[in-house]
């Protein structure tokens, strides 16, 4: 995709933007020339209160936007809010959503003679995807190629409709970056074909179930993956296991990931900004403060706040010192949100077949974590650590992910 700047159409008091440069979302393709990527992009559209400046001085031809943006974020280089495909950014902007992709569409018969289909038009990608395609062919995998690279089929077809009739789809990205998972992968899921991936090293985080994706991590994996493809093609029961999620539903992990996109990234940006503004207001001496704990006999009652991911308003939860555990918090959250007859924010977006009827807690985590931390790495090791967190953070704030 081309080098692009997008204006963030949100008015924010200038006093909150002192020494900050936010409002510019930049996206690059890994095939951009160094000279183009290094060019500063200065944009002002009547925004008197702030300068929108993005200078890509860290560009390397082997790196994509994540490698440019995140070091600036981590190193305190002046960007207050980062929006990229990375789940480690402040506001992730992924390619996935329930509304854009009919992920639970039924599986069709595999009628094509070739085992796999490929749609690759950028023949100058910075990874080894063309070598992978050639390596699979040398290993005996028959491939119908509809794109501009290695074309042997007429490319004037509906991509998803064509993919439905192949056992495998070559979901080969143009760069191998964490969380950079594009429509190539999600269209494969819609089509009910098994994705063979060259791309994100953590593609398993995006898999709808264990064993549903084949991953070529490096060139040496090509022969092994080709052998697996042939095995699955010759053993229908084993192949059908790879698509079992289409009939029984994807994992909670997958649902929790895609549910994030039920709230548009621009709305999640607003929630982030509003949360920061509120936190600054709460630190003010003039703000009315509710007590964070009180005594009741020999017990201490702790007041904490919880909101569903993708929403702004908090709900009050009270925990007793005699049962100050994560499980107690989960139980209290379910009780409170059931009482409120809460409808999960993702419910209108999810396919009806996998919505479920009862609230279930997937994750509860301290407010302020990235989605990578919240979904995949953060945990309270035990009751002691949870208690320490509550005691060290008066009126602790949490987010909950329902599935």
Predicted regions mapped to residue ranges:
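Pol beta-like nucleotidyltransferase catalytic core
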Residues: 1-32, 36-50, 56-58, 62, ...
């Amino acid at each position: 995709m081309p080098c692009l700047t997008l204006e963030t159409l949100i008015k924010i008091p200038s006093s909150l933007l002192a020494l900050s440069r936010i409002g510019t979302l930049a996206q690059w393709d890994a095939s951009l020339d160094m000279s183009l990527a290094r060019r500063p992009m200065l944009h002002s559209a009547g925004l008197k209160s702030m300068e929108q400046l993005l200078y890509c001085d860290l560009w390397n031809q082997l790196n994509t936007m994540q490698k440019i943006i995140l070091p600036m974020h981590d190193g305190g280089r002046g960007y207050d809010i980062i929006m990229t495909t990375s789940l480690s950014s402040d506001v992730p902007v992924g390619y996935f959503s329930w509304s854009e992709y009919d992920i639970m569409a039924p599986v069709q018969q595999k009628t094509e003679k070739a085992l796999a289909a490929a749609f690759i038009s950028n023949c100058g990608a910075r990874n080894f995807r063309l070598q992978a395609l050639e390596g699979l062919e040398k290993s005996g995998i028959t491939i119908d190629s509809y794109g501009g690279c290695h074309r042997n089929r007429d490319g004037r077809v509906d991509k998803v409709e064509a993919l439905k009739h192949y056992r495998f789809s070559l979901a080969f990205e143009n760069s191998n970056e964490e969380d950079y998972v594009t429509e190539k992968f999600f269209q494969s899921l819609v089509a009910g074909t098994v994705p063979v991936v060259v791309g994100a090293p953590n593609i398993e985080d995006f898999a709808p179930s264990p064993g549903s994706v084949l991953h070529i991590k490096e060139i040496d994996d090509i022969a092994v993956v080709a052998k697996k493809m042939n095995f699955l093609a010759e053993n229908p029961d084993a192949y059908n296991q790879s698509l079992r999620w289409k009939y029984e539903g994807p994992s909670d992990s997958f649902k929790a990931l895609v549910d994030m996109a039920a709230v548009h990234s621009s709305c999640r940006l607003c929630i982030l900004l509003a949360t920061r503004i509120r936190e600054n207001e709460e630190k003010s001496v003039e703000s009315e403060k509710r007590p964070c704990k009180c005594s009741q006999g020999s017990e201490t009652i702790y007041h904490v706040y919880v909101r569903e991911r993708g929403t702004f308003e908090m709900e009050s939860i009270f925990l007793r010192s005699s049962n100050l555990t994560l499980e107690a918090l989960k139980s209290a959250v379910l009780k409170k949100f059931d009482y409120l007859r809460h409808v999960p924010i993702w419910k209108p977006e999810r396919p009806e077949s996998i919505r479920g009827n009862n609230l279930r807690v997937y994750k509860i985590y301290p407010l302020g974590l990235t989605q990578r931390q919240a979904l995949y790495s953060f945990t309270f090791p035990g009751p002691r650590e949870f208690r320490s967190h509550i005691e060290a953070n008066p009126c602790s704030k949490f987010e909950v992910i329902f599935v």
